[in-house]
């Protein structure tokens, strides 16, 4: 009988401790949530500024994003609309190259409405360290090769790695990774050029 009482007391005590830990954890979460959200937003803004220069827009890019549902935007997860005095001046696409050497490569591609690439950055990848990871800006300047490059119906063949007859460098021992990034950047630009009317409609959903 005494054993039952002791066990019961320990059970109540452990339950109380668990409840107290939950309350403390919840309190810490709510106290730090705003700070965490602010840090994430700052990182997102910094990344967007790497693909769309500040002088292109005076709206809030983070509040000007749309998740496209139309089948014409396959492979595009999100579109940020850069506006200058209410007029569209550029786009940033969150897009995914499905054919990296080690799987998906998530990209952020900045474009102006005429087909000029303003910048490209890698958001996430799983490519081989020392080979495919040269697509990262912190490791090499390769990704900067897209900046100010234009795409149109007359130069589509140039939008490939040199091994495939294009103008973009591949990496020694790693052609698949840069090929995937070049091809997805090209696809993103063509989606933008071929869907101007749809983009105008989508832009009405944001500030």
UniProtKB/Swiss-Prot annotation:
E.C. code: 7.-.-.-
Recorded superkingdom: Bacteria
Location in or out of the cell: Cell inner membrane
UniProt KW Cell membrane keyword: yes
Taxonomic lineage from the root: Bacteria, Pseudomonadati, Pseudomonadota, Gammaproteobacteria, Pasteurellales
InterPro entries according to UniProt: FMN-bd, Ion_transpt_RnfG/RsxG
Protein's UniProt name: Ion-translocating oxidoreductase complex subunit G
Record's bilayer topology term: Single-pass membrane protein
């Amino acid at each position: 009988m005494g054993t039952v009482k002791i066990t019961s007391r320990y059970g109540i005590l452990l339950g109380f401790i668990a409840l107290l830990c939950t309350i403390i954890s919840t309190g810490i979460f709510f106290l730090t949530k705003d700070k965490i959200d602010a840090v994430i937003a700052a990182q997102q803004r910094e990344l967007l500024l790497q693909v769309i220069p500040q002088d292109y827009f005076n709206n809030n890019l983070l509040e000007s994003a749309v998740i496209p549902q139309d089948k014409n935007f396959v492979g595009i997860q999100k579109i940020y609309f850069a506006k200058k005095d209410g007029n569209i001046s550029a786009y940033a696409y969150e897009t995914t190259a499905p054919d990296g050497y080690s799987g998906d490569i998530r990209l952020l591609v900045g474009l102006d409405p005429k087909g000029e690439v303003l910048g490209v950055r890698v958001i996430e990848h799983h490519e081989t360290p020392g080979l495919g990871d040269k697509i990262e800006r912190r490791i090499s300047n390769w990704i900067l090769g897209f900046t100010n490059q234009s795409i149109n119906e007359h130069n589509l063949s140039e939008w490939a790695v040199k091994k495939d007859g294009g103008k973009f460098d591949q990496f020694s021992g790693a052609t698949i990774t840069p090929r995937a990034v070049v091809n997805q950047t090209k696809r993103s630009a063509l989606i933008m050029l071929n869907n101007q009317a749809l983009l105008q409609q989508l832009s009405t959903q944001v500030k």
